[in-house]
Amino acid sequence: MTSDELTLVGEVATPLGEITASLLCLHPNPTGGGMMDSHIFKKAANRLPAMAGIQVIRFNTRGTSSEAGTSEGAYDHGVGESEDVTAAINYCFETLKVKTLWVVGWSFGTDLALCYAKDPRVAGLILLSPPMQRTPDNVLEFWQNDSRPVVAYVPEHDEYLNPEQAVERFKIFPRLNLIPIPGAKHLWVGEPFVHLILSEITKQLAPQGLPLPIEI
């Protein structure tokens, strides 16, 4: 439950054996169909626990629906969602008792990650297709002065922010590890890109789990 007393819908996918690391997923914008079942995150939950021992935590931000249900509240354009991110991080540490937590944001979720996942217990951030529509410069300055790893994967053909534009947008955050992905688009459609992104997540969280199998 959030501090403004909203109940959020979520799911936790946990390995049968040892947990190598935990991953909290912040989904794309629900106004464009984003939710906790957005395909990269759904496939991460289905695969990474067994393949790499990574625990995957997904949830719907306020007012967002998926097959599992609808989170209470209403979409708040990335403002009230700060409470959702805080509640999810607290849940990970206080209820799940995670030891190492990374936060991954995709599209709208990257703005949520940068702006609201500053909790010192978070080990690092992964940004997928960052549009940089809601993150002010002072937030980038915060992360520039922070020692935790932040990695951004920017599709070559992203219609919101391509690699060349990303270099300019992130110029006040030179510490960022910005990785352009040739041939990719904003939504990472296609199994080759899914496997690539899941492999990159594993590389950051649990490199001993590489290479990921093509099938399980």
Where do the PLM segments sit?
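Serine-hydrolase catalytic machinery in alpha/beta-hydrolase-like enzymes
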Residues: 1, 6-98
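Active-site nucleophile loop of the alpha/beta-hydrolase fold
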Residues: 28-29, 127-135, 155-157
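Residue in the alpha/beta-hydrolase core beta-strand immediately N-terminal to the catalytic nucleophile
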Residues: 102, 124-126
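Gly/Ala-rich beta-loop-alpha elbow adjacent to hydrolase catalytic centers
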Residues: 104-113
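Short alpha-helix in the alpha/beta-hydrolase fold that links the catalytic acid
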Residues: 138-140, 148, 161-171, 193
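Short beta-strand/loop motif that positions the catalytic acidic residue
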Residues: 146-147, 151-154, 158
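Catalytic histidine-centered segment of alpha/beta-hydrolase-like enzymes
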Residues: 160, 184-196
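Catalytic histidine neighborhood in serine/cysteine hydrolases
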Residues: 171-187
